[in-house]
């Protein structure tokens, strides 16, 4: 069985030395170091060496991240939870404030403030459009790939706003740094739109309530 599986892996080009593969069901996550007809050796991220039979990769699903590296884009899929009680219509004074504030002035440039049907937008609508504009204008985002900012199903913890896009740098460390920078900026924008980001009460919050 192992020999046949090794031949199948080779003929179907399912993996090769240097590929990053992941099989959560078996705790496998690392770089392929050696491929033979009877064994596959994988260097895990903690530098331990995992040895598995080829038939394991034929009989069970696994992820090969090499296609992601070749595509030129690495996905960011993050969401923030908006306190639903902070959602409100955006009046003219509020819109003007956003158009003149240093942090939102450029993001608001050209952003519509009401729908084609004449329905006035809320602060969340404007926030999502500005976040989308921020992503669309960012030089380190892969603009050839899908990008969107959307609402998910409301939950007991608030309204999830999801950012979905791809960075142009697929290297792990650089990707994580950019993800941190962009998400921190997106979260810092929220209070300027009078949006409260929900988080579970901390010990300090509970002590404050008790007083």
Where are the regions that the model predicts?
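Short, structured beta-strand/loop micro-motifs enriched in basic residues and often containing a Trp
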Residues: 1-6
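Long, non-transmembrane cytosolic or organellar matrix-exposed soluble domains/tails
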Residues: 100-211
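Soluble accessory domains appended to multi-pass membrane transport proteins
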Residues: 11-115, 125
């Amino acid at each position: 069985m192992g020999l046949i599986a090794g031949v199948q892996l080779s003929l179907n080009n399912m993996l090769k030395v240097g590929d990053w593969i992941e099989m959560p069901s078996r705790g496998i996550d690392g770089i392929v170091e050696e491929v033979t007809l009877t064994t596959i050796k994988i260097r895990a991220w903690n530098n331990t060496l995992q040895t598995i039979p080829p038939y394991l990769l034929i009989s069970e699903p696994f992820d090969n991240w090499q296609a992601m590296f070749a595509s030129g884009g690495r996905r960011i899929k993050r969401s923030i939870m908006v306190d639903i009680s902070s959602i409100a219509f955006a009046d003219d004074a509020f819109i003007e404030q956003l158009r003149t504030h240093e942090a939102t002035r450029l993001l608001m440039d050209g952003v519509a403030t009401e729908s084609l049907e004449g329905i006035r937008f809320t602060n969340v609508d404007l926030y999502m459009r500005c976040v989308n504009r921020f992503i669309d204008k960012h030089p380190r985002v892969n603009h050839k790939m899908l990008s969107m900012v959307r609402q998910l199903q409301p939950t007991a913890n608030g309204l999830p706003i999801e950012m979905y896009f791809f960075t142009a740098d697929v290297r792990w460390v650089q990707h994580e740094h950019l993800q941190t920078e962009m998400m921190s900026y997106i979260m810092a924008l929220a209070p300027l739109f009078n949006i409260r980001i929900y988080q579970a009460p901390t010990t300090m919050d509970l002590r404050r309530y008790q007083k």
